[in-house]
Amino acid sequence: MHVTAQTLPWMDPSLPPEQRASLLIAAMTLDQKVQQLHGASGGPPEIPACGTNNIRQVPAIASLKIPTFRITNGPVGIGGGDCNPQDPATALPIALALAASFDPALAFSFGSVIGNEALTLGLHELEGPGMNMAREGRGGRNFEYMGEDPILAGTMSSAEIPGIQQYGIIAMSKHFILNDQEVNRMSANVVVDDRTFHELYALPFEMTVKDGKVASIMCSYNRVNGPFACDNPYTLTTMLRGQWGFTGYVQSDFGATHSTAVSLNAGQDFEMQSGTNYSLARITAALADGSLTMATIDRALSRRYVQMFKFGIFDRPITRGQIDAVANGQIARSIAEQTAVLLKNQGDLLPLNAASIHSIALIGQSTYAAAAASGGGGSSRVVPLYTITPLQGLQNVLTSLGSTATVSLLTVPTNPTAANLAAVTAAAAGADVAIVMAGVVTSEGSDRPSLALPNNQDAIITAAIAANNPRTVLVLKDGDAVLMPWVDQVPAILEAWNPGEEDGNVVARLLFGLVNPSGKLPVTYPKLASDTPTSLVERYPGVTIGGVPTITYSERLQMGYRWYDAQGIAPLFPFGYGLSYTKFAYGPVQVTPATTDGTTPVTVQFTVQNVGTRAGADVPQIYVGFNPLIGEPPKRLVTWKKVTLNPGEQQLVTLTIDPKASSHPISTWDSPSQQWVPARGKLSVYLARSAGEIASTAFATVVFPSSGVPGDVNGDSVVNCADLSAVTLALGTRTGQAGFLPTADIDHNGVIDVRDASAVARTLPAGTRCS
């Protein structure tokens, strides 16, 4: 077909995206198709100022009106893109901080800032949000992710994605999948059982597909139970498209493509960055030997083009505008203020009373006390449009309060001498208030060597404590949990995370009570490194098996707070924990109906009252615990609500546990049948302040309905391995006991025994094999 400017039917915006993609692909030569299967170095010709030494783009094909496809990181704002030097953008708080807000509406605002700025800068694809689990606290990229709980991560990310995509920007859930550490991230084989895989690590991705409607997925570097993630037909096709119904496209991480035909056939659609495996020579060879078909190439192109047409990328010009730094900076500040977690407040030291303060000593290393902790490093690093330092923030707030207090900054070197530490003690002793700032800024490419604060910061904190100043406040600016050997000696601790460009204003407004802290920990803070679930070398950093670095998730479902619960280990600060400048009282939790078939919603109600003297927000959390025979950890978070109340105000909170939700709140993954199955038997519903503090408990019972089909225990009208699994787990139970399933009592004698299991086994379809 000879294409001219008059014969470009795919440029008709009234046509459906699928039809436009089909028309375009039909007009392309093989050379053009291959050029569009991978990224390339260069610069967007539409924006000459971006230069030519850039990597995140697919070059335009002017004759076909295919625009330059412009890609940018990342999970914490506009990171590295296809402009050199990198475009400055709003430095939001890190993603882990966002998770600490437990507020999906805030996640939407977070995504809206990113989407708005991506559109303003003429970009098309945003490589984020980051969906990996904070399984290992030393993980260098945990700052890009949403914590250790899959439902929290999935809920927050699913709220962020529409914020991004409303601006015609393609969001991308990454890194799919099990890319949970930086050590050997490009080569490791991650070994995990199927149930753990689905219930913990795949679940947040599933939620972003079903709830967030994410348009693209990035497959990761590592191997997944053998095959590389970008070569894996089970994850990329069976699970992602078959089980979840994903219709977008899959892009590789940079250099994560390890094959040509294998990856395309498995379900990868687009290679980043250079096209080593999707080169014309290799594609041609694969077509020639029959390992690859033109239909598969066209499928890969269509998946991306459909999204590009859907998001208007073919129909809008590429221009670079001016970001509204003031408006977006105010949003960034508001978000950061709602993410900080008050860990300790002995004697109600906080908020500080400006009227009683004449001098403040601001102490710490430059990264935390002299500069704004605007975020982590690596490809997601944001170049901030501006920053507010801690000193500037304190001065701004003191001025707004009419205070004339002085703030003296003492910057401590990374290798402090005895004289440096003596100066810390003297400064803390000589001021009305000592504010010590410490923390961790992590980066892609390496994990932390330990959970301890780096660069001798423990010594600085200890030196400040030695001053015996009762008004000593520690502000932590972390990218994950840290060890706190001095915790008992510090009166007040505020976890501010890496709060972004507005660091100084955020922290000062929190310390002086202009904002009441309301964040809750999205990760568990251990007392000791040996308490963590990954203290065994096979679990982290892994061992070499057959010449391949191998990480074994042998803790199985006991990840994060589930580990501490199951092992009976008391953490320093539990998941979901966070104090306030006010107090909240919870009424008893009530659950209706008391019996459910595992498909109908369960309603949870309770009251929350602000019994303090300040307005504030709290996050009551609902966890559920299952019949112990099912083999789950003691409890899992299923839902929550952020509640804002004035002093004395009370609110009736109603939450729904919907078994049909994409989070599968009361189901477990049944590997033999490859499906989610409602957890049968007694269901404990916990109203909690954190994973470590249950306020009230109620109960429900999940009973499968009878379908009338012989051997159908779970009531889905089909007899399969899930039914045999259900009756096996209920063996030994009697009528009236927790875990008894009437539908599993095949002989109706009031006890579930081997005769019932045998009866179910006999009704299985011929040839069925169950593990």
Report each predicted region and the residues it spans.
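Surface-exposed charge patches in extracellular/virion surface proteins
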Residues: M1-H2, R539-V543, D597, R734-P742, ...
